[in-house]
Swiss-Prot record:
The organism of origin for this protein: Nitratidesulfovibrio vulgaris (strain ATCC 29579 / DSM 644 / CCUG 34227 / NCIMB 8303 / VKM B-1760 / Hildenborough)
Role according to the record: Catalyzes the oxidation of 5,10-methylenetetrahydrofolate to 5,10-methenyltetrahydrofolate and then the hydrolysis of 5,10-methenyltetrahydrofolate to 10-formyltetrahydrofolate.
Family named by the database record: Belongs to the tetrahydrofolate dehydrogenase/cyclohydrolase family.
EC number of the protein: 1.5.1.5, 3.5.4.9
Protein name, per record: Bifunctional protein FolD
Length: 286
């Protein structure tokens, strides 16, 4: 069984980006800039934002965090986004979700300039993904695809099953897996709460992707011998973080598997950095 170490892979990507930023900054005359907006006091969101800030600092990206009160209004939030859209030193804007009740997250995401939408959630970027056109890809599924490529695990011509259909992971991941390319080109099935026999569908997968937010839900008897299992789930339990699969059991039948934590999570942040650097290069004409 091969452990797909997202933490180590993400560290390698940060090293590559650090070298690229150092080489290009003299021509750009500034470092890449990322604005992170956090509204409210959700503990998990605060941890995620700190991790992103740390990764930016480690890579050479200037990270500017805007920590707003939970009483922030829709108008105030959209005004901040509008200001960041026109700031020349900001290459990417990330709105940390979820937002407090009363705020319309979709409206806020649509207010972000698509050219600075490094999270890849603007309808324009999602539409470009669906059409196979260049654009920012959502960070978690793009990080998953990068992890497969770095480990030379190609789903091309194979059966891929995605469990979960969220706009953040399931839908875009299915589109990426089914797109042309050496590390894509899979035959994709998307499963969800309406799937009659989920276990049977999972057992057909050469590549199984889990993104349902249910701790240890997928067990070894639901996984084909030799399958590659990518667990996107991050669930807080009484005993700590757990993925969507029973790692101990599934790792005995899988040929490769991501751990939780240390699998997809670090790759999500790495992809955010990649997107930010890409925006910086375009905006600076590099």
């Amino acid at each position: 069984m091969q452990l797909l170490d997202g933490k180590a892979t993400a560290a390698t990507i940060r090293e590559e980006l650090r070298a690229e930023i150092a080489a290009l900054t003299p021509r750009a005359r500034r470092a890449p800039g990322l604005a992170v907006i956090l509204v409210g006091e959700d503990p998990a969101s605060q941890v995620y934002v700190r991790n992103k800030e740390r990764a930016c600092h480690d890579t050479g990206i200037v990270s500017e965090a805007f920590r707003l009160a939970p009483t922030t209004t829709q108008e105030e939030l959209e005004r901040l986004i509008a200001d960041l859209n026109v700031r020349p030193d900001i290459d990417g804007i990330l709105l940390q979700l979820p937002l407090p009740r009363g705020l319309d997250a979709q409206r806020c995401l649509e207010a972000i300039d698509p050219a600075k939408d490094v999270d890849g959630f603007h309808p324009q970027n999602m539409g470009r993904l669906a059409l196979g056109l260049p654009g920012f890809r959502p960070c978690t599924p793009a990080g998953v695809m990068t992890l497969l490529e770095r480990y030379d695990l190609s789903p091309s011509g194979r059966k891929a099953v995605v469990v979960g259909r969220s706009n953040i992971v399931g839908k875009p991941l299915a589109l990426m897996l089914g797109a042309p390319g050496k590390y894509a080109n899979a035959t994709v099935t998307v499963c969800h709460s309406g799937t009659p026999d989920l276990a049977a569908e999972c057992r057909t997968a050469d590549f199984l992707f889990l993104a349902i937010g249910r701790p240890r839900f997928v067990t070894a008897d639901m996984v084909r011998e030799g399958a590659v299992v990518v667990d996107v789930g991050i669930n807080r339990t009484e005993t700590g973080l757990a993925g969507d699969c029973d790692f101990e059991g599934v790792s005995r039948v899988a040929s490769a598997i991501t751990p939780v934590p240390g699998g997809v999570g670090p790759m999500t942040i790495a992809q955010l950095l990649v997107n930010t650097v890409q925006s910086w290069k375009v905006r600076c004409g590099l």
